[in-house]
């Protein structure tokens, strides 16, 4: 995957793989590569994780506990999906995680968080 770069206006899109409609979609979208390095966040994800700073280029395993990291590693190894609901600070969320592929091989993980 070439040339991931971040800009102040959050056009942190790798190639043309993320369509324009994802940028302002009313859910949080975070995408990482196969090593767990975050390569994309839409506007909602940037806002959701603002207190952690710019996450593009950081490893998502640094942001998860061991149990969650093990699930993510399994998804990356198997190309699988995972979905669950959580409640944090009285807010209910639905989380969907799925490996994404490039030329038939797992290239990373996409997480969609819906409130």
Task: Briefly describe each language-model feature range.
Residues 6-37, 41:
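Sensory modules in modular signal-transduction proteins
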Residues 1-12, 106-110, 114-115:
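Short, low-complexity N-terminal regulatory "tails/caps" that precede and couple sensory modules
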């Amino acid at each position: 995957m070439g040339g991931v770069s971040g800009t102040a206006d959050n056009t942190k899109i790798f190639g043309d793989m993320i369509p324009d409609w994802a940028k302002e979609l009313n859910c949080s979208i975070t995408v990482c590569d196969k090593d767990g390095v975050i390569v994309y966040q839409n506007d909602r994800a940037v806002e959701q994780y603002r207190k952690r700073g710019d996450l593009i280029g950081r490893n998502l395993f640094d942001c998860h506990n061991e149990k969650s990291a093990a699930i993510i590693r399994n998804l990356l190894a198997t190309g699988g999906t995972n979905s669950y609901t959580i409640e944090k600070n009285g807010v209910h969320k639905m989380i969907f995680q799925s490996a994404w592929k490039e030329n038939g091989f797992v290239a990373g993980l996409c997480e969609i968080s819906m409130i």
